[in-house]
């Protein structure tokens, strides 16, 4: 894999990084690329947050922990100070790589080391800066060619070197180069093997990562959209809160005015009640005078009615006395009528006996005739307008009595006399 690291504002790419690659190895590769010595620290930055990586930490593992935000994380190589001994050495004139070369691979030892071999990782305390002394080293120094270096130093220091020593040095270098070529061939074969083995998985991983990047972009867009919406809603909420405060202030003012109005209303109601009571007192006085006048008038009318009732009582007593006298006279007349009726019947009977010379049987008169005659007598004395009308001295006899007075005989005798 490739790891992007920012060095002095320039982005550099470190190739061949795996999950077991440590920060120390990445820093060594970058220090060799820029050709500078000193104390270096690898920093993991996300937005405004920075974290110093320890030398034994794995940058790939640390980036994977960020998940969908891994693309926003930056790795920065920062020089924190000079080396322990800034001395010019024979290697200080080593070739400094050009600034245009931005790709630097890890040392071959880091590639050839087995993934399972973690015993050689240094156990250093976290957040410890890395210190490198000396200039940039070559491949022979990386492979630990101490003998060749010492031999070359002897050759350079000894100006009287012989041709045999030079040939010996050439043969030694040729052997080393052949060994390196063989090692490179084996490494290339291994690389081809792993490329063939993981080409499909790498393509799938690339596709998956591209899809993930797209999803991350969509999520970022959605997040930006919702952040904008949140800001809009917050502004609206702030405006609504301001409006609410204004409304509350207005409500408070209205409540104060309402209290003043209620006090005025209570005062006016008290005045109206007092005025109403005054009017009611005046009206009660006027009504009392009117009632007194009406009472006097009613008393006068009651006196008149009392006098009239006395007169009526006296009249009623006189009428009752007259009625008693008339009733007594009527009873006397009825008794006289009964006596006359009996005498008349006897006279008629004697006349009938004398005319016919026969013996007859006298039947008693029917009671209905006597009751009818009494009813006729009672109806002749009505009362009109509360005054008694006394009957006159002359009184007509019933029609049946007039018939009996005539001595004429008839075929039908109403008195019930049969031969």
UniProtKB/Swiss-Prot annotation:
Coiled coil: none annotated. Residues 1-82 form the Ras-associating domain. GO terms for biological process: signal transduction. The modification Phosphothreonine is found at residue 131. It holds the Pfam family RASSF8-10_RA. Residues 382-399 have a biased composition (Polar residues). Residues 372-399 are annotated as: Disordered. Keywords: Phosphoprotein. InterPro entries: N-RASSF, RA_dom, RASSF8/10_RA, RASSF8_RA, Ubiquitin-like_domsf. The modification Phosphoserine is found at residues 105, 129, 387. This is Ras association domain-containing protein 8. It comes from Mus musculus (Mouse). The gene is Rassf8.
């Amino acid at each position: 894999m490739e790891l992007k690291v920012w060095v002095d504002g320039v982005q550099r790419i470190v190739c061949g990084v795996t999950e077991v690659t440590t920060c120390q190895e990445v820093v060594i590769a970058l220090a060799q690329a820029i050709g500078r010595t000193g104390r270096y620290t690898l920093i993991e930055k996300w937005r405004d947050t920075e974290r110093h990586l320890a030398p034994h930490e794995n940058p790939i593992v640390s980036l994977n922990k960020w998940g969908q935000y891994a693309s926003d994380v930056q790795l920065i190589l920062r020089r924190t100070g000079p080396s322990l001994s800034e001395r010019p050495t024979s290697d200080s004139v080593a070739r400094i790589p050009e600034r245009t070369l931005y790709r630097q691979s890890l040392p071959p030892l880091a590639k050839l080391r087995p993934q399972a071999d973690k015993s050689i990782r240094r156990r250093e305390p976290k957040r410890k800066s890395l210190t490198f002394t000396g200039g940039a080293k070559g491949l022979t120094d990386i492979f630990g060619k101490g003998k060749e270096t010492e031999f070359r130093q002897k050759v350079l220091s000894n100006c009287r070197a012989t041709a045999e020593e030079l040939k010996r040095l050439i043969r030694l270098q040729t052997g080393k180069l052949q060994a390196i070529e063989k090692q490179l061939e084996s490494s290339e074969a291994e690389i081809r093997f792993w490329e063939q083995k993981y080409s499909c998985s790498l393509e799938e991983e690339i596709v998956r990562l591209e899809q993930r990047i797209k999803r991350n972009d969509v999520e970022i867009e959605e997040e930006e959209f919702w952040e904008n919406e949140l800001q809009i809603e917050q502004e609206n909420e702030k405006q609504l809160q301001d409006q609410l405060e204004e409304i509350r202030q207005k409500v408070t003012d209205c409540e104060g005015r309402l209290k003043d109005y209620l006090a005025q209303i209570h005062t006016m109601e008290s005045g109206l009640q007092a005025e109403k009571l005054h009017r009611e007192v005046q009206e009660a006085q006027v009504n009392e005078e009117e009632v007194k006048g009406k009472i006097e008038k009613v008393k006068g009318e009651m006196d008149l009615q009392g006098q009239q009732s006395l007169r009526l009582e006296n009249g009623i007593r006189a009428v009752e006395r007259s009625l008693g006298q008339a009733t007594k006279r009527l009873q006397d007349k009825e008794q006289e009528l009964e006596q006359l009726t009996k005498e008349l019947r006897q006279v008629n009977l004697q006349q009938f006996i004398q005319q016919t010379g026969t013996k007859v049987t006298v039947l008693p008169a029917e009671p209905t005739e006597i009751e009818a005659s009494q009813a006729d007598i009672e109806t002749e004395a009505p009362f009109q307008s509360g005054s008694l009308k006394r009957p006159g001295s002359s009184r007509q006899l019933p029609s049946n009595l007039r018939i009996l007075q005539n001595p004429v005989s008839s075929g039908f005798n109403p008195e019930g006399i049969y031969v």
